[in-house]
Amino acid sequence: MAKSIPSAGLRLRLRLRRNARRRSRKSTRKIPKGVIHVQASFHNTIVTVTDVRGRVISWSSAGTCGFKSTRKGTPFAAQTAAGDAIRPVVDQGMQRAEVRIKGPGLGRDAALRAIRRSGIRLSCIRDVTPLPHNGCRPPKKRRV
């Protein structure tokens, strides 16, 4: 018994239905609470939004927002990156979030200001910058 080959039109409809199912599942996911990670170095700022379990929902950095070279480390670049990462999450219905800030960069406060302005209620703001308890020897001092 030979299998019948489906027509081209039927194959196209099946493929479209499969793609529509994938897309719809992504957009209908409601996330009421999440965690916003801000990693601010002197050269760049990366903002990642995750759900409570740690799965990444959206992310952005100063580099992906179009800033290059030394401009990536500026507070304005951090503010733009934070707004860019939070916009799709607010559309998905996030109302409350916890903020975790890591690093010594200039973009720490600017990113936090942008998060506050987005309308998400912040349950807590935590500084998770790693500090050594006299661990590795630091590099030698720079002589210019």
Swiss-Prot record:
Coarse class of the protein's main subcellular location: plastid
GO CC annotation terms, alphabetical: chloroplast; ribonucleoprotein complex; ribosome
Molecular function GO terms recorded: rRNA binding; structural constituent of ribosome
Subunit details: Part of the 30S ribosomal subunit.
HAMAP family noted in UniProt: Ribosomal_uS11
Family: Belongs to the universal ribosomal protein uS11 family.
Protein name in UniProt: Small ribosomal subunit protein uS11c
Gene symbol of the encoding locus: rps11
